[in-house]
Amino acid sequence: VAASSALPTTSSGTTAGAAGAPGVPEPARQHTKAGAIAFAEHYIGLINSVGQEPKVGVLEPLALASCKSCDNFEGTIKYFVAHKQRFDGPQYKIKKSNVTGYSEIATFIRVEASEPAVSIVAASGSNVKRYPEVLKSVSIFRLDWRSGWRVVTIQGES
């Protein structure tokens, strides 16, 4: 790649035009279709990680306060922290993701995943509840760009 075709970087070393909440990986900070896909996949990855190692405040900066599905994920984590519980594995394994709509107003990402069998476990290691495997789960993310991607809604595909 010629030096003239490289994107300019800021003094912090991030690509010019990149934005987003702290901790969001570089590909998910781009205001592009690929950036939107990377952001939706990053959000699912965080759901998996905070489900297994619960920590409040990780998901909240990535979504609008009006996102009801996001509130549900955040509420589960708050409950886990308060009751010293966690998932014993990831809740989602992404199979494929693609853009289904892209405009200046909103971007829609379709994420197809499987849901492995997973248990909620107590600090003692005892099983609290077991969820069966779901082979196909499809979620439609509506993302808006507001100095970085933010989740507006997550809906199941009917």
Summary of predicted features, one role per range:
Residues A16-F87:
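Core segments of small alpha/beta cavity-forming domains
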Residues V1, G101-S158:
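Exposed beta-sheet edge and beta->alpha loop/turn motif
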Residues V1-A21:
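Amphipathic, hydrophobic N-terminal targeting peptides for secretion and organelle import
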Residues A82-T100:
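A short, amphipathic edge element
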